[in-house]
Amino acid sequence: MAEFVRAEILGTKFEYTTRYVNLQPIGMGSFGLVCSAFDQITQQLVALKKVMKPFDGSSLAKRTYREIKLLKYLRHENLICLRDIFISPLEDIYIATELLGTDLSRLLSVKPLDSQFAQYFIYQILRGLKYIHSANVIHRDLKPTNILINENCDLKICDFGLARLQEPQMTGYVSTRYYRAPEIMLTWQRYGVQVDIWSAGCILAEMLRGKPLFPGKDHVHQFHLITNILGNPPKSVLEKITSKNTMKFVQSLPSREPRDLSTIVPKDTDFDAIDLLKKMLVIDPDIRVSAQDALRHPYLAPYHDPTDEPVAAGPFDWSFNNMDLPKETWKVMIYSEVLDYLSVDSPDSGSMALGGSSPFDHRALDREFSEFFDDREGPM
Protein backbone atom coordinates (compact mmCIF):
# COMPACT_ATOMS: atom_id res chain seq x y z
CA MET A 1 0.00 0.00 0.00
CA ALA A 2 1.32 3.44 -0.91
CA GLU A 3 2.68 5.71 1.80
CA PHE A 4 1.30 9.25 1.94
CA VAL A 5 2.80 12.58 3.00
CA ARG A 6 0.72 15.49 4.29
CA ALA A 7 1.58 19.14 3.69
CA GLU A 8 -0.18 22.49 3.61
CA ILE A 9 0.36 24.50 0.42
CA LEU A 10 -1.20 27.95 0.06
CA GLY A 11 -3.68 27.05 2.77
CA THR A 12 -4.66 23.83 1.01
CA LYS A 13 -3.99 20.43 2.54
CA PHE A 14 -2.07 18.19 0.16
CA GLU A 15 -1.93 14.45 0.82
CA TYR A 16 0.27 12.76 -1.75
CA THR A 17 2.29 9.59 -2.16
CA THR A 18 5.99 9.42 -1.37
CA ARG A 19 6.56 8.96 -5.10
CA TYR A 20 6.46 12.77 -5.36
CA VAL A 21 8.84 15.27 -3.73
CA ASN A 22 9.68 18.97 -3.89
CA LEU A 23 6.13 20.26 -4.40
CA GLN A 24 5.87 23.91 -5.44
CA PRO A 25 2.60 25.76 -6.16
CA ILE A 26 2.30 26.91 -9.76
CA GLY A 27 -1.32 28.06 -9.93
CA MET A 28 -4.97 27.25 -9.94
CA GLY A 29 -6.29 25.05 -12.72
CA SER A 30 -9.92 24.31 -13.42
CA PHE A 31 -11.35 23.47 -10.01
CA GLY A 32 -8.04 22.61 -8.38
CA LEU A 33 -4.70 23.74 -6.97
CA VAL A 34 -1.73 22.71 -9.12
CA CYS A 35 1.83 22.10 -7.89
CA SER A 36 4.96 21.11 -9.69
CA ALA A 37 6.48 17.94 -8.25
CA PHE A 38 9.38 15.64 -8.98
CA ASP A 39 8.35 12.08 -9.81
CA GLN A 40 10.97 9.78 -8.30
CA ILE A 41 9.89 6.86 -10.48
CA THR A 42 10.11 8.52 -13.88
CA GLN A 43 12.72 11.08 -12.76
CA GLN A 44 10.63 13.81 -14.39
CA LEU A 45 8.75 16.88 -13.26
CA VAL A 46 4.97 16.65 -13.28
CA ALA A 47 2.02 18.93 -12.62
CA LEU A 48 0.12 17.54 -9.64
CA LYS A 49 -3.43 18.80 -9.24
CA LYS A 50 -5.61 18.30 -6.22
CA VAL A 51 -9.21 18.27 -7.41
CA MET A 52 -11.07 20.59 -5.05
CA LYS A 53 -14.10 19.03 -3.34
CA PRO A 54 -14.85 16.54 -6.11
CA PHE A 55 -17.77 15.00 -4.23
CA ASP A 56 -19.42 18.13 -2.82
CA GLY A 57 -22.23 17.86 -5.35
CA SER A 58 -23.32 15.80 -8.31
CA SER A 59 -22.28 18.46 -10.84
CA LEU A 60 -18.72 18.67 -9.45
CA ALA A 61 -18.46 14.89 -9.28
CA LYS A 62 -19.66 14.60 -12.87
CA ARG A 63 -17.13 17.21 -13.99
CA THR A 64 -14.33 15.28 -12.28
CA TYR A 65 -15.47 12.04 -13.90
CA ARG A 66 -15.55 13.71 -17.31
CA GLU A 67 -12.05 15.16 -16.96
CA ILE A 68 -10.56 11.82 -15.86
CA LYS A 69 -12.29 9.96 -18.69
CA LEU A 70 -11.02 12.47 -21.25
CA LEU A 71 -7.45 12.43 -19.93
CA LYS A 72 -7.44 8.64 -20.08
CA TYR A 73 -8.83 8.52 -23.60
CA LEU A 74 -7.09 11.38 -25.41
CA ARG A 75 -3.52 10.38 -26.30
CA HIS A 76 -1.65 12.63 -28.68
CA GLU A 77 1.72 14.39 -28.84
CA ASN A 78 0.07 17.83 -28.78
CA LEU A 79 -2.20 17.10 -25.82
CA ILE A 80 -1.15 17.04 -22.19
CA CYS A 81 -0.46 13.47 -21.07
CA LEU A 82 -1.84 11.81 -17.95
CA ARG A 83 0.94 10.41 -15.72
CA ASP A 84 -0.86 9.25 -12.59
CA ILE A 85 -4.15 9.34 -10.68
CA PHE A 86 -4.56 8.46 -7.04
CA ILE A 87 -7.05 8.82 -4.21
CA SER A 88 -5.70 9.92 -0.83
CA PRO A 89 -6.75 8.47 2.55
CA LEU A 90 -8.96 11.56 2.97
CA GLU A 91 -10.65 10.58 -0.31
CA ASP A 92 -9.31 13.52 -2.29
CA ILE A 93 -8.42 12.97 -5.94
CA TYR A 94 -5.01 13.89 -7.35
CA ILE A 95 -4.18 13.99 -11.05
CA ALA A 96 -0.58 14.10 -12.29
CA THR A 97 0.20 15.24 -15.82
CA GLU A 98 3.42 16.05 -17.62
CA LEU A 99 4.86 19.49 -16.86
CA LEU A 100 6.15 21.85 -19.52
CA GLY A 101 8.25 24.94 -18.89
CA THR A 102 5.74 27.69 -19.61
CA ASP A 103 2.57 28.61 -21.45
CA LEU A 104 1.89 30.74 -24.50
CA SER A 105 0.36 33.54 -22.44
CA ARG A 106 3.61 34.09 -20.53
CA LEU A 107 5.63 34.14 -23.73
CA LEU A 108 3.29 36.68 -25.32
CA SER A 109 3.48 38.88 -22.22
CA VAL A 110 7.23 39.40 -22.70
CA LYS A 111 7.51 40.37 -26.35
CA PRO A 112 5.96 39.56 -29.73
CA LEU A 113 6.84 36.15 -31.10
CA ASP A 114 9.00 35.79 -34.18
CA SER A 115 7.02 34.62 -37.20
CA GLN A 116 8.72 31.20 -37.13
CA PHE A 117 7.29 30.55 -33.66
CA ALA A 118 3.77 31.63 -34.64
CA GLN A 119 3.86 29.32 -37.64
CA TYR A 120 5.16 26.29 -35.75
CA PHE A 121 2.86 26.82 -32.76
CA ILE A 122 -0.35 27.18 -34.79
CA TYR A 123 0.61 24.04 -36.70
CA GLN A 124 0.87 22.08 -33.45
CA ILE A 125 -2.37 23.57 -32.10
CA LEU A 126 -4.24 22.53 -35.25
CA ARG A 127 -2.57 19.11 -35.19
CA GLY A 128 -3.90 18.61 -31.68
CA LEU A 129 -7.35 19.93 -32.59
CA LYS A 130 -7.60 17.56 -35.54
CA TYR A 131 -7.18 14.67 -33.11
CA ILE A 132 -9.55 16.10 -30.47
CA HIS A 133 -12.28 16.81 -33.01
CA SER A 134 -11.92 13.35 -34.57
CA ALA A 135 -12.83 11.99 -31.12
CA ASN A 136 -16.03 14.07 -31.21
CA VAL A 137 -14.73 16.33 -28.46
CA ILE A 138 -14.86 20.13 -28.27
CA HIS A 139 -12.25 21.75 -26.02
CA ARG A 140 -14.36 24.93 -25.52
CA ASP A 141 -11.73 26.83 -23.55
CA LEU A 142 -8.78 27.20 -25.90
CA LYS A 143 -6.65 30.21 -24.92
CA PRO A 144 -2.94 31.03 -24.48
CA THR A 145 -2.88 29.93 -20.82
CA ASN A 146 -4.06 26.48 -21.92
CA ILE A 147 -1.26 26.14 -24.48
CA LEU A 148 1.82 24.69 -22.76
CA ILE A 149 5.28 24.93 -24.34
CA ASN A 150 8.73 23.63 -23.45
CA GLU A 151 12.20 24.86 -24.37
CA ASN A 152 12.23 22.64 -27.47
CA CYS A 153 9.10 24.37 -28.80
CA ASP A 154 7.00 21.27 -28.19
CA LEU A 155 3.42 22.41 -27.64
CA LYS A 156 0.60 20.70 -25.77
CA ILE A 157 -3.03 21.68 -25.23
CA CYS A 158 -4.20 21.28 -21.64
CA ASP A 159 -7.18 21.77 -19.32
CA PHE A 160 -10.06 19.65 -20.55
CA GLY A 161 -12.23 20.60 -17.58
CA LEU A 162 -14.75 22.33 -19.84
CA ALA A 163 -14.56 19.96 -22.80
CA ARG A 164 -17.91 18.73 -24.10
CA LEU A 165 -19.63 17.12 -27.02
CA GLN A 166 -21.93 20.10 -27.15
CA GLU A 167 -23.05 22.70 -24.62
CA PRO A 168 -25.97 25.11 -25.08
CA GLN A 169 -24.93 27.43 -22.24
CA MET A 170 -21.81 29.50 -22.69
CA THR A 171 -19.37 29.82 -19.83
CA GLY A 172 -18.71 33.27 -18.44
CA TYR A 173 -15.01 33.35 -17.75
CA VAL A 174 -13.59 36.80 -18.51
CA SER A 175 -10.22 35.33 -19.45
CA THR A 176 -11.92 33.22 -22.09
CA ARG A 177 -14.01 35.95 -23.66
CA TYR A 178 -11.29 37.17 -26.02
CA TYR A 179 -11.25 33.76 -27.71
CA ARG A 180 -14.96 32.96 -27.65
CA ALA A 181 -16.67 32.15 -30.95
CA PRO A 182 -19.55 34.37 -32.16
CA GLU A 183 -22.03 31.49 -32.19
CA ILE A 184 -21.58 31.06 -28.44
CA MET A 185 -22.19 34.76 -27.82
CA LEU A 186 -25.25 34.61 -30.07
CA THR A 187 -26.67 31.93 -27.75
CA TRP A 188 -27.09 29.27 -30.39
CA GLN A 189 -28.79 26.19 -29.00
CA ARG A 190 -26.08 23.94 -30.41
CA TYR A 191 -22.53 24.51 -31.56
CA GLY A 192 -19.73 22.31 -32.72
CA VAL A 193 -15.99 21.85 -33.01
CA GLN A 194 -15.76 25.05 -35.05
CA VAL A 195 -15.66 27.06 -31.80
CA ASP A 196 -12.13 25.73 -31.22
CA ILE A 197 -11.05 26.84 -34.71
CA TRP A 198 -12.24 30.38 -33.93
CA SER A 199 -10.25 30.36 -30.69
CA ALA A 200 -7.17 29.08 -32.53
CA GLY A 201 -7.60 31.86 -35.09
CA CYS A 202 -7.68 34.44 -32.31
CA ILE A 203 -4.51 32.90 -30.88
CA LEU A 204 -2.78 33.01 -34.29
CA ALA A 205 -3.73 36.68 -34.67
CA GLU A 206 -2.39 37.41 -31.19
CA MET A 207 0.91 35.69 -31.97
CA LEU A 208 1.26 37.72 -35.17
CA ARG A 209 0.20 41.02 -33.55
CA GLY A 210 1.70 40.65 -30.10
CA LYS A 211 -1.64 41.55 -28.48
CA PRO A 212 -5.20 40.15 -28.39
CA LEU A 213 -7.35 40.74 -31.46
CA PHE A 214 -10.71 41.04 -29.68
CA PRO A 215 -10.06 42.26 -26.09
CA GLY A 216 -13.71 42.83 -25.20
CA LYS A 217 -14.65 44.41 -21.87
CA ASP A 218 -17.96 42.54 -21.86
CA HIS A 219 -20.08 40.44 -24.23
CA VAL A 220 -21.53 43.46 -26.05
CA HIS A 221 -18.16 45.16 -26.49
CA GLN A 222 -16.67 41.84 -27.61
CA PHE A 223 -19.19 41.48 -30.41
CA HIS A 224 -18.69 45.11 -31.48
CA LEU A 225 -14.94 44.46 -31.81
CA ILE A 226 -15.61 41.39 -33.95
CA THR A 227 -17.99 43.20 -36.31
CA ASN A 228 -15.61 46.18 -36.53
CA ILE A 229 -13.12 43.87 -38.23
CA LEU A 230 -15.20 41.12 -39.83
CA GLY A 231 -18.37 43.04 -40.66
CA ASN A 232 -21.98 42.26 -39.77
CA PRO A 233 -23.11 38.65 -39.37
CA PRO A 234 -24.47 37.22 -42.63
CA LYS A 235 -28.06 36.10 -43.08
CA SER A 236 -27.01 32.46 -42.63
CA VAL A 237 -25.97 33.30 -39.06
CA LEU A 238 -29.03 35.39 -38.23
CA GLU A 239 -31.31 32.52 -39.23
CA LYS A 240 -29.88 30.38 -36.43
CA ILE A 241 -30.42 32.90 -33.62
CA THR A 242 -33.24 31.72 -31.35
CA SER A 243 -33.20 34.48 -28.73
CA LYS A 244 -35.36 37.53 -29.49
CA ASN A 245 -33.14 39.78 -27.37
CA THR A 246 -30.03 38.58 -29.17
CA MET A 247 -31.65 39.13 -32.55
CA LYS A 248 -32.70 42.63 -31.50
CA PHE A 249 -29.13 43.43 -30.44
CA VAL A 250 -27.58 42.13 -33.68
CA GLN A 251 -30.08 44.02 -35.82
CA SER A 252 -29.31 47.22 -33.91
CA LEU A 253 -25.64 47.13 -34.89
CA PRO A 254 -24.51 49.75 -37.41
CA SER A 255 -23.74 48.50 -40.90
CA ARG A 256 -20.09 47.47 -41.17
CA GLU A 257 -18.07 46.05 -44.03
CA PRO A 258 -15.29 43.51 -43.38
CA ARG A 259 -11.79 44.92 -43.19
CA ASP A 260 -8.76 43.53 -44.95
CA LEU A 261 -7.02 41.44 -42.28
CA SER A 262 -3.65 42.58 -43.59
CA THR A 263 -4.39 45.91 -41.86
CA ILE A 264 -4.51 44.37 -38.39
CA VAL A 265 -1.17 42.52 -38.49
CA PRO A 266 2.40 43.78 -39.03
CA LYS A 267 3.19 44.84 -42.59
CA ASP A 268 5.77 42.09 -43.05
CA THR A 269 3.32 39.31 -42.13
CA ASP A 270 3.39 36.38 -44.54
CA PHE A 271 0.53 36.48 -47.06
CA ASP A 272 -0.27 32.82 -46.40
CA ALA A 273 -0.56 33.53 -42.67
CA ILE A 274 -3.16 36.21 -43.37
CA ASP A 275 -5.02 33.90 -45.74
CA LEU A 276 -5.21 31.14 -43.11
CA LEU A 277 -6.40 33.70 -40.58
CA LYS A 278 -9.22 34.70 -42.95
CA LYS A 279 -10.36 31.09 -43.17
CA MET A 280 -10.31 30.59 -39.39
CA LEU A 281 -11.96 33.86 -38.35
CA VAL A 282 -15.25 33.43 -40.20
CA ILE A 283 -18.42 34.47 -38.36
CA ASP A 284 -20.47 31.67 -39.93
CA PRO A 285 -19.08 28.43 -38.43
CA ASP A 286 -20.54 26.37 -41.27
CA ILE A 287 -17.94 27.80 -43.65
CA ARG A 288 -15.11 28.13 -41.12
CA VAL A 289 -12.14 25.95 -42.04
CA SER A 290 -11.74 22.62 -40.22
CA ALA A 291 -8.56 21.62 -38.40
CA GLN A 292 -7.86 18.96 -41.00
CA ASP A 293 -8.22 21.39 -43.91
CA ALA A 294 -6.25 24.10 -42.11
CA LEU A 295 -3.30 21.71 -41.79
CA ARG A 296 -3.24 21.48 -45.59
CA HIS A 297 -2.96 25.25 -45.98
CA PRO A 298 0.18 26.54 -47.74
CA TYR A 299 1.17 28.50 -44.62
CA LEU A 300 1.77 25.21 -42.80
CA ALA A 301 3.43 23.40 -45.72
CA PRO A 302 6.87 23.27 -44.01
CA TYR A 303 5.39 21.06 -41.27
CA HIS A 304 2.36 19.38 -42.81
CA ASP A 305 2.72 15.61 -43.04
CA PRO A 306 -0.56 13.71 -43.58
CA THR A 307 1.11 10.50 -42.40
CA ASP A 308 2.00 12.08 -39.04
CA GLU A 309 -1.22 13.89 -38.13
CA PRO A 310 -3.18 11.12 -36.43
CA VAL A 311 -6.84 10.94 -35.51
CA ALA A 312 -8.46 9.21 -32.55
CA ALA A 313 -9.20 5.49 -32.70
CA GLY A 314 -12.89 6.34 -32.48
CA PRO A 315 -15.33 8.82 -30.97
CA PHE A 316 -15.18 9.43 -27.24
CA ASP A 317 -18.01 7.75 -25.32
CA TRP A 318 -20.29 10.57 -24.17
CA SER A 319 -23.09 8.28 -22.99
CA PHE A 320 -22.66 9.52 -19.42
CA ASN A 321 -23.08 13.17 -20.37
CA ASN A 322 -26.86 13.25 -20.07
CA MET A 323 -26.98 11.15 -16.92
CA ASP A 324 -28.45 12.81 -13.84
CA LEU A 325 -26.96 10.74 -11.06
CA PRO A 326 -26.44 11.31 -7.32
CA LYS A 327 -22.94 12.22 -6.23
CA GLU A 328 -22.51 8.84 -4.53
CA THR A 329 -22.95 7.09 -7.87
CA TRP A 330 -20.49 9.44 -9.60
CA LYS A 331 -18.05 8.72 -6.77
CA VAL A 332 -18.23 4.97 -7.40
CA MET A 333 -17.77 5.56 -11.14
CA ILE A 334 -14.74 7.80 -10.52
CA TYR A 335 -13.15 5.19 -8.25
CA SER A 336 -13.73 2.60 -10.95
CA GLU A 337 -11.97 4.78 -13.55
CA VAL A 338 -9.00 5.32 -11.22
CA LEU A 339 -8.69 1.61 -10.47
CA ASP A 340 -8.92 0.84 -14.17
CA TYR A 341 -6.08 3.27 -14.88
CA LEU A 342 -3.91 1.84 -12.11
CA SER A 343 -4.53 -1.74 -13.23
CA VAL A 344 -2.37 -1.19 -16.31
CA ASP A 345 0.99 0.48 -16.77
CA SER A 346 0.65 4.24 -17.06
CA PRO A 347 1.31 5.07 -20.72
CA ASP A 348 4.24 7.27 -21.49
CA SER A 349 3.74 10.03 -24.01
CA GLY A 350 7.42 9.83 -24.98
CA SER A 351 9.26 12.62 -26.67
CA MET A 352 7.81 14.68 -29.45
CA ALA A 353 8.30 13.22 -32.90
CA LEU A 354 7.92 16.44 -34.84
CA GLY A 355 11.60 17.32 -34.71
CA GLY A 356 12.82 14.45 -36.84
CA SER A 357 11.88 15.86 -40.23
CA SER A 358 10.89 19.36 -39.20
CA PRO A 359 12.92 22.34 -40.45
CA PHE A 360 12.34 24.08 -37.12
CA ASP A 361 15.20 25.02 -34.77
CA HIS A 362 13.98 23.31 -31.61
CA ARG A 363 16.37 25.16 -29.30
CA ALA A 364 15.44 28.60 -30.58
CA LEU A 365 12.76 29.23 -27.96
CA ASP A 366 15.14 28.39 -25.13
CA ARG A 367 17.53 31.04 -26.41
CA GLU A 368 14.77 33.64 -26.81
CA PHE A 369 12.94 33.03 -23.51
CA SER A 370 15.51 31.28 -21.32
CA GLU A 371 14.14 32.86 -18.13
CA PHE A 372 11.09 30.58 -18.35
CA PHE A 373 13.09 27.37 -18.51
CA ASP A 374 15.56 27.71 -15.63
CA ASP A 375 14.30 24.99 -13.30
CA ARG A 376 13.85 22.08 -15.64
CA GLU A 377 15.64 19.42 -13.65
CA GLY A 378 14.59 17.55 -10.56
CA PRO A 379 16.05 18.08 -7.08
CA MET A 380 19.82 17.79 -6.84
From Swiss-Prot:
The modification Phosphothreonine is found at T171. The active site is at D141 (proton acceptor). Its cofactor is Mg(2+). It holds the Pfam family Pkinase. Dually phosphorylated on Thr-171 and Tyr-173, which activates the enzyme. The modification Phosphotyrosine is found at Y173. Residues 20-300 form the Protein kinase domain. Its EC number is 2.7.11.24. It is an enzyme of class 2 (transferase). InterPro entries: Kinase-like_dom_sf (IPR011009), MAP_kinase (IPR050117), MAP_kinase_CS (IPR003527), Prot_kinase_dom (IPR000719), Protein_kinase_ATP_BS (IPR017441), Ser/Thr_kinase_AS (IPR008271). ATP binds at I26, G27, M28, G29, S30, F31, G32, L33, V34, K49. PANTHER family: MITOGEN-ACTIVATED PROTEIN KINASE (PTHR24055). This is Mitogen-activated protein kinase mpkC.
